[in-house]
Amino acid sequence: MAGLRVEVISLFPDMFAAISEYGITSRAVKQGLLQLNCWNPRSYTEDRHQTVDDRPFGGGPGMVMKIKPLELALADAKRAAGGKAKVIYLSPQGRQLKQADVRELANEEALILIAGRYEGIDERFIEAHVDEEWSIGDYVLSGGELPAMVLIDAVTRLLPGALGHAGSAEEDSFTDGLLDCPHYTRPEVYEGKCVPEVLLSGNHEHIRRWRLQQSLGRTWERRADLLDSRSLSGEEQKLLAEYIRQRNDS
């Protein structure tokens, strides 16, 4: 099985060493599960200053990335990707990326990620070439490189064989619409704080129910909006009600 191809168009390709040289994504690259290439629009300019931006029409602060270098870089990225590659622009104007979206992207054969800079890129490029716009949150960053790396990392975790333990991705936060439960490791007691007894019991069913209850409770406390879009089973409703009752009594 060929790995997922990710072609990135960025003015700062060296930043993506964080993906190719470290952690799970690095291992995926070495195993051939992820193929990562970067394309710098500066390499497609025709002037000695390698100009990739210009002032915005209508005035205003900042600069806007020019169309031509982006189009030429995109053409090479598409040729490298082969076949049909989904073109994604990382943008604060995009839809907010959710785990369900990541799962869909992990099924693609190839992705081309556009990492903008300055005030953004010429809208005509977006209209002509971009399939989807995605945002990683409601805050301002200096460019699209970090969001692109977030997307690559999230997608890579879902590629078969990328994680050391096959069940790790299924147990992550958001995978089933809930936040993750608390985790503990040795020592059993640290500065007077003990690991919950149920985790030491060896009773797998009790442990499963405790973890599910903690996930439900943590989601209710911190991200109640996630519960609004999730239909709880009878067991989940009972566990959450018990969690809330215990919290109110404490």
From Swiss-Prot:
Its primary localisation, in coarse terms, equals cytoplasm
CDD domains annotated for this entry? TrmD-like
Extract one GO cellular component term from the record: cytosol
Which GO-annotated molecular functions does the record name?
tRNA (guanine(37)-N1)-methyltransferase activity
Compartment list? Cytoplasm
**Binding positions for S-adenosyl-L-methionine?**
G116, I136, G137, D138, Y139, V140, L141
Under the heading Pfam families, the entry gives: tRNA_m1G_MT
Protein EC = 2.1.1.228
Provide the alphabetized UniProt keywords. Answer: Cytoplasm, Methyltransferase, S-adenosyl-L-methionine, Transferase, tRNA processing
Which reaction is recorded as catalysed by this protein?
A: guanosine(37) in tRNA + S-adenosyl-L-methionine = N(1)-methylguanosine(37) in tRNA + S-adenosyl-L-homocysteine + H(+)
One of the GO BP terms on file:
tRNA N1-guanine methylation
Q: How does this protein assemble?
A: Homodimer.
Q: NCBIfam families recorded for this chain?
A: PRK00026.1, trmD
Instruction: Give the similarity note.
Output: Belongs to the RNA methyltransferase TrmD family.
**Role this protein plays:** Specifically methylates guanosine-37 in various tRNAs.
This chain belongs to the protein called tRNA (guanine-N(1)-)-methyltransferase
Specify the species.
Stutzerimonas stutzeri (strain A1501)
Q: What is the lineage of its organism?
A: Bacteria, Pseudomonadati, Pseudomonadota, Gammaproteobacteria, Pseudomonadales
Quick one: which gene encodes this?
A: trmD
